[in-house]
């Protein structure tokens, strides 16, 4: 049975619409209008168009952050993807850890990104759930009322090198240089931060779980479902992704199926500053990256060898 970790009133969340200006060299945004709650924000996320993907000025519904999180585990690097049922779009995708930026953090989106890692990527050990550090700052423990966090061996979260083109919040340049794109179907500005998560070697065995909030009966509810970890690892080779997905439970990697899988729009092609797609099929993304799916493991080769052996015995019997 899924375990309820927390309930929130969505009306407590407030954000602001944005005015965004983009040129081929940089992008800037600033808040406009009146604060909106979660429901009002969803209602405002309607498709927009821009005449030139490199140069435009437009008003958008909200600011979102995503984290392309690289986990180092047993001397290998993996990207972290999480499963999400997107209630506002009626689909299920694998996406980067992500969330909405509240009004008071519009000029500090990195702070929101760090909190999203703490909320959506849960690391379990036999002694409890790992706490985390970003540089010298403790990450929040969002489910401390329901889960036992251990501080003795925290994971560490560090920023990686950012995108080439700068992004400004008002007159303030975001030092971490997140990748930015305007998602036209939802009229939102999205910032993607590259981060690395190191798990202490002593914290073994580990299991990884994803927890996300769902809107239920006018409440935001977060549940932990052990039978559906909903967190997937994509292995990297020399920094490039491989066409494989795994879940991790008690230090054991288990392959995850990819049939009919869709990835969120952050994996789709970006044209200038804009992304036009709602989502992208797993197979199409592999093709876009120049990859092919791994061949399915079958017993054909083993069966063929056995058949040859039997054929040899049969021939031997006939020649006698």
Question: Residue locations for each model-derived region?
Answer:
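N-terminal leader/linker segments that precede catalytic domains of diphosphate-processing enzymes
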Residues: 1-115, 122-320
